[in-house]
Amino acid sequence: MSLMNWIKNSAVILITCICICPSLRAAEECDKALPEYEAILKSGLKSGALYYNIANCYLEKGQVGKAILNYKRAMYFIPRDSAVRINYGYALSRTRQRDTTAKSPYFITLLNGAFNFFSLKETVLIFFICYFLAAALIIMKKFVKKHRFALGGLSILFIMATIMIAMPLSNKIKEAEKEAIIISGTTDARMEPASDATSLFPLYEGMKVYVIKSNEGWCKIKRPDNKTGWIAAKDLSMVTGPSTQF
């Protein structure tokens, strides 16, 4: 072996040790940590930080679907956490999915985007605050003679706010009840709940779907673009399943 080849081979070995070995150590640490995290969940303790750590472990192990699933769960607790959102975006970038979101009017998209920074509980709280303020102002307008014009204007403002908040709140409730993530590799949505049924379209690991109904180990799902099909229940996991209710 020539000196130059020896130097090249040594450099490759050195780079491999520097780049891959820490990754392997991290994966080994994740293998040890995951059972402990899962045990905490089974004990009934849930938090955004716990789901975030679980997601990071799955991401390190290359299980992108389960990573996205747990980042979504973390965002139910800590929707404004920048680390969760950055890692969630990175996990999405590692999937094969294409954008299947149905097009919505710009105003609706903007409104939903704004309320993505609030948890479901926070959105419900804001909705009821606006609702009760609107009701209180309407009652005050009937009994208070002074400033009726101002009270009427404020009541209209809070009524409009209540209606506007109702739209993203409805979407959040829908997602909390039906949202699921594909956790297997590529799977096919089928026309009927049977493995030999006609394949309709592929679903990739990490894709978001909505579960419409279940039937003996199969789930009828709907993509965000409203295409529907049947897949095996083992290929997906509900974001807010029985053990992850918020």
Q: Where are the model-predicted features located?
A:
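Conserved beta-strand/loop element in small beta-rich adapter and peptidoglycan-binding domains
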Residues: 198-215
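Membrane-embedded alpha-helical segments of integral membrane proteins
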Residues: 102-141
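Boundary regions of SH3-family modules and the immediately adjacent low-complexity/disordered segments
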Residues: 147, 153-184, 191-194, 198, ...
